[in-house]
Amino acid sequence: MGFGWQGSVSIAFTALAFVVMAADWVGPDVTFTVLLAFLTAFDGQIVTVAKAAAGYGNTGLLTVIFLYWVAEGITQTGGLELIMNFVLGRSRSVHWALARSMFPVMCLSAFLNNTPCVTFMIPILISWGRRCGVPIKKLLIPLSYASVLGGTCTSIGTSTNLVIVGLQDARYTKAKQLDQAKFQIFDIAPYGVPYALWGFVFILLTQAFLLPGNSSRYAKDLLIAVRVLPSSSVAKKKLKDSGLLQQSGFSVSGIYRDGKYLSKPDPNWVLEPNDILYAAGEFDVVEFVGEEFGLGLVNADAETSAERPFTTGEESVFTPTGGAPYQKLVQATIAPTSDLIGRTVREVSWQGRFGLIPVAIQRGNGREDGRLNDVVLAAGDVLILDTTPFYDEEREDSKNNFAGKVRAVKDGAAKEFVVGVKVKKSSEVVNKTVSAAGLRGIPGLFVLSVDRADGSSVEASDYLYKIQPDDTIWIATDIGAVGFLAKFPGLELVQQEQVDKTGTSILYRHLVQAAVSHKGPIVGKTVRDVRFRTLYNAAVVAVHREGARVPLKVQDIVLQGGDVLLISCHTNWADEHRHDKSFVLLQPVPDSSPPKRSRMVIGVLLATGMVLTQIVGGLKSREYIHLWPAAVLTSALMLLTGCMNADQARKAIYWDVYLTIAAAFGVSAALEGTGVAASFANGIISIGKNLHSDGAALIAIYIATAMLSELLTNNAAGAIMYPIAAIAGDALKISPKETSVAIMLGASAGFINPFSYQCNLMVYAAGNYSVREFAIIGAPFQIWLMIVAGFILCYMKEWHQVWIVSWICTAGIVLLPALYFLLPTKVQLRIDAFFDRVAQTLNPKLIIERRNSIRRQASRTGSDGTGSSDSPRALGVPKVITA
């Protein structure tokens, strides 16, 4: 290679930085900043300080930063949430749910930066998915992908696009090639739109096979017991009419009644109160279905109690809602040397030995489904267990019997507030059940009861009650779900009148958690007696008390030391009362500012006006105003009109993104100045010349950028690759616009690694995905889009034909399933069952599990000569009947 020691140093330390970032040891913002400082330390022989610092003032980067302000202003008004809730409507299948959710997001993210777009869409899709009965995991990865795909349709759709636009402008303006410097807002659309459409098509066609169900990151395909509550909506109904058989990710493998276990029950079986159903599925799904249909979770202890007729005392093993309570669920795997192997679950003294109670066990492992207590334990079995006060992870017995680390799965004892919300007359929840309104199944949120306007009450167990105007819904919620509840359209806090009387402008209002001091002056008094609003100019919205659910009426609660108050107050309130003797801890609740709906129209119009300045300028090939000052002026108007406050604007900026992009600019300047970029560009030039095709060179640029995007962030990948691609493009006489398009598409193609893109990371956490689940859909998606990009880049001159074919194919694939719903229900169920079998047949994990199960069963048969995999101790209790 034709570069000296400067190039060698640049390559070596840049490669080291890639390793550090790929291993996630240090974030890209810090890594690139340190790398850039190091490269400037050679007296300007690698890169001068001036060139290294130039990236911090790049107009493309400044545009990215100030567009965060615009997005924050729109989000704070709640306008986009109302629009998206209207657009989403209702859906009857995963196919239509994806079509309804992905396409609007793609359109929206073409003009609004995809990161804030995903931020406000996550809670909307979670609630909407629950209302439609669609597994949340089927929606959140496509949400991230849709926001990325939509962002490739315009030059302002993603921060990466803006970065590349800025780099192109700076490069060719400096070279006095002004005709090549400008990249208009829709210059990428002829290529980005087909790219997005074919990505959309891939998700629709493969969702049944590649997208995960509504599961956690931990054990899947569990055997879980649930009890039909007396008030359940499925009681006295046939199994086929109950709605349980239509639930995705949930199947009934058996039913226990009157001392008998019925395996594979007939769909005509009539369910009775206190029946125990044995569900095969994933914990989150089963828990949601249980809440939806009135089924209580049954652990091993409760299952034992249910073997005898219920008496008054024995019913206490269930909570008032009918389920066995759990504190903190953990997952454990039976070790190969465990003395539990060969014993049934009922024969183990779980609480005495481990301080644990079995809740569920992973199916398979060479045995048929049965009752939880009758399962014969084997090496490798994965159990979900509840913890008791006597649980100690470091106990020697636990270490000897469980392989590896016992992992926490779910906390059932999280801090809980009881919040009352009143239903407005115009609310969309009116005349809907609690489930249909989207208020069931939301993580951290549980409906307790409904107080009707006439003074009567409806318990949460009444699953058929339809909400009416002026009803008060009492909800138990953890702090994470409070923000969702505060922004739910058509609901307002019961304490809203008290909140309004504080006089605090909605612009500066948020929530704070305040822990009551044990020796404070408000202990032993009610909120009303304290005259809390008058004394503190704040309103108590809810109260949490450890180990107890406090009464619903906030004003009449007698405060105790250790109570945690949820307070609506001014943003400065926590600082002003930091040393107040009434409280020992004050903690603001993130993202708890109420939506400024009265400013919704203003916010949307201002953002639309900003986008129109770029659209009109692009159509007339004239820049009336650069997007950077346009974004700043739009944000200023949003501040003046009360769409957001200054603190919210400051916090909206992702400074790690700024530092990453700016430093990456400097590193790319170092690679270009030392000749490293030119050396790598020669490889791309050789590909183009050897294949006599500009398209081949552009494909090489796309693939190299996409691979780099999986290792780094999308912005860093674009900044590093741009000088390399630009040199190659100039040598091959490729238009700078076409070169930039290849980099823009490639830099956004971070689909396999959830940590490679900010949008991926947000849905990864919200959906509780595993890295493997991302890779299963992301790897084939990446390959598919490489093929699509190859065609698009090779036929850039024929983009009109590519557009027509893409739109026609997309329309056909989206609309063709509409014919499915014209078929009779029985035929639909048969088709669904067929595709479920196909999906299971093609699932590599299930194929391996089936083979291992057959091998284990054959091994056991050979060793005991019985030809059966069941232990004698598991037989006879209870009697098993096959329908």
From Swiss-Prot:
Bilayer-spanning residue ranges: 3-23, 30-50, 60-80, 106-126, 139-159, 185-205, 600-620, 624-644, 657-677, 693-713, 774-794, 802-822
Functional description taken from the UniProt entry: Na(+)/sulfate cotransporter with a probable high-affinity for sulfate and a proteasome dependent turnover.
Record keywords, A-Z: Cell membrane, Membrane, Repeat, Stress response, Sulfate transport, Symport, Transmembrane, Transmembrane helix, Transport
Organism: Chlamydomonas reinhardtii
Subcellular localization(s) per the UniProt record: Cell membrane
Family the entry assigns: Belongs to the divalent anion:Na+ symporter (DASS) superfamily. Na+/sulfate symporter (TC 2.A.47.4) family.
Biased composition (Low complexity): 861-871
Induction: Up-regulated by sulfur deprivation.
Database matches in Pfam families: CitMHS, TrkA_C
Region (Disordered): 857-883
Effect of a null allele: No effect on sulfate uptake, due to the redundancy with SLT1 and SULTR2. Slt1 and slt2, as well as slt1 and sultr2 double mutants show a 50% decline in uptake while the slt1, slt2 and sultr2 triple mutant exhibits no increase in sulfate uptake capacity when deprived of sulfur. Modified regulation of the SLT3 gene that becomes up-regulated by sulfur deprivation instead of down-regulated as in wild-type.
GO MF term list: monoatomic cation transmembrane transporter activity; sulfate transmembrane transporter activity; symporter activity
A cellular component term, taken from the record's GO annotations: plasma membrane
Gene Ontology biological-process annotations: potassium ion transport
Protein's membrane topology: Multi-pass membrane protein
Domain RCK C-terminal: 211-295, 317-401, 406-491, 497-583
Name by which UniProt lists this protein: Sodium/sulfate cotransporter 2
